[in-house]
UniProtKB/Swiss-Prot annotation:
Protein name stated in the entry: Transcriptional coactivator YAP1
Gene: Yap1
Upregulating conditions: Down-regulated by alpha-amanitin (AMA).
Native source species: Rattus norvegicus
CDD domains hit by this protein: WW
Lyase keyword on record: no
Length: 469
């Protein structure tokens, strides 16, 4: 009995399958595409949408822009539309919109430039703003650092400092019942720094006198406003920058001892103006002068540390310079010998810091040499005679005595390098110099450099000297 024939499978319908319908009658979501396939959706109105976007930008009036709610129709408090009213003088109701507008802020220049030496027509004094012809003689170019004055410095008479809820400081003037954000101590400090006939430029004189002598060909001068500038007579130019702060000059000049700091003359007591500087003005001047001296002392200490680091960096390069052909006097001097001993004692070598100096015994191999090359193996010509080792690169006899006379002095200056140089004299020195110099050239033979011969099949079978992993 023959088995019943199965009907052939029906081919899949061409085109996209119709979406399945849920029992509720709504079309279900289309099935997810199989892995590796992408579904591309084509929209017929894409060009129309892009054109509408361009029209909205090019013609904003004709575009359908949604109407915004006017400000009056929004739920805003009444104080949003009314300016604040000036209140009485108190901490709770302090504002700068009241009578405090009489004190206009003044920008004090911190760094000068040749094009901005003239100040404006008005200047800030202790009693307020003075403008007009009377302010012209008192208009000076002030140098002032942009740092906050510490809280321990006392305020002028009639002033009080308070803080807002956010922690910002403001100042209360009980004399005229005003508040301000500006620190009145800065104005007082700027008045003390104004150069007058009695005390011309005390901080600048202190800074310049403690910096050491000027380089050759330089001269220091001062303008009518008390600004210090420098004249270079070599190329006939002027500069606002101090040439002593140039790192090239600091490297060339060896500072053996710090320059003595000249104490400034005592400031003449100034008469208080407007009742702000009261009877405690002399104490305030002394405190401000003490702060300036402390700042100058800290600046000099940092500068001295920087110069000391530069000096150590230069001296650390002396051994390499001496080996390349430097002079003997700079190394064999007693002062430099003591400094080299100090530097090597402070180095990171455990043998040099242990106290008992490490001394090398006399060596019979080629471990000690005048050359900087290292030999991984004993040369083949080491046991041959001197005549057979003539490679044509012998060291000239004129340079050997200078090396023999220079290196013992330098090696004796370093602790822990008690080297016996007896084996480096005469023929042994010549043998070692001839032997070590061409050792690097022997290692790089022509067979290594010839890539084609190494990669050739016959070369790999017969004369291969490489180990392939």
């Amino acid at each position: 009995m023959e088995p019943a024939q199965q009907p052939p499978p029906q081919p899949a319908p061409q085109g996209p399958a119709p979406p399945s319908v849920s029992p509720a009658g709504t079309p279900a979501a289309p099935p997810a595409p199989p892995a590796g396939h992408q579904v591309v959706h084509v929209r017929g109105d894409s060009e129309t949408d892009l054109e509408a976007l361009f029209n909205a930008v090019m013609n904003p009036k004709t575009a359908n822009v949604p109407q915004t709610v006017p400000m009056r129709l929004r739920k805003l408090p009444d104080s949003f539309f009314k300016p604040p009213e000036p209140k009485s003088h108190s901490r709770q109701a302090s504002t700068d919109a009241g009578t405090a507008g009489a004190l206009t802020p003044q920008h004090v220049r911190a760094h000068s430039s040749p094009a901005s030496l003239q100040l404006g027509a008005g200047t800030l004094t202790a009693s307020g703003v003075v403008s007009g012809p009377a302010a012209t003689p008192a208009a000076q170019h002030l140098r002032q650092s942009s740092f906050e004055i510490p809280d321990d410095v006392p305020l002028p008479a009639g002033w009080e400092m308070a803080k807002t809820s956010s922690g910002q400081r403001y100042f209360l003037n009980h004399n005229d019942q005003t508040t301000t954000w500006q620190d009145p101590r800065k104005a007082m400090l700027s008045q003390l720094n104004v150069p007058t006939s009695a005390s011309p430029a005390v901080p600048q004189t202190l800074m310049n006198s403690a910096s050491g002598p000027l380089p050759d060909g330089w001269e220091q001068a001062m303008t009518q406003d008390g600004e210090v500038y420098y004249i270079n007579h070599k190329n006939k130019t002027t500069s606002w920058l101090d040439p002593r702060l140039d790192p090239r000059f600091a490297m060339n000049q060896r500072i053996t001892q710090s320059a003595p700091v000249k104490q400034p003359p005592p400031l003449a007591p100034q008469s208080p103006q407007g009742g702000v500087l009261g009877g405690g003005s002399s104490n305030q001047q002394q405190q401000i002068q003490l702060q300036q001296l402390q700042m100058e002392k800290e600046r000099l200490r940092l500068k001295q540390q920087e110069l000391f680091r530069q000096e150590l960096a230069l001296r650390s390069q002396l051994p390499s310079l001496e080996q390349d052909g430097g002079t003997q006097n700079a190394v064999s001097s007693p002062g430099m010998t003591q400094e080299l001993r100090t530097m090597t004692t402070n180095s990171s070598d455990p043998f040099l810091n242990s106290g008992t100096y490490h001394s090398r015994d006399e060596s019979t191999d080629s471990g000690l040499s005048m050359s900087s090359y290292s030999i991984p193996r004993t040369p083949d010509d080491f046991l041959n005679s001197v005549d057979e080792m003539d490679t044509g690169d012998t060291i000239s006899q004129s340079t050997l005595p200078s090396q023999q006379s220079r290196f013992p002095d330098y090696l004796e200056a370093l602790p822990g390098t008690n080297v016996d140089l007896g084996t480096l004299e005469g023929d042994a020195m010549n043998i070692e110099g001839e032997e070590l110099m061409p050792s690097l050239q022997e290692a790089l033979s022509s067979e290594i450099l010839d890539v084609e011969s190494v990669l050739a099949a016959t070369k790999l079978d017969k004369e291969s000297f490489l180990t392939w992993l």
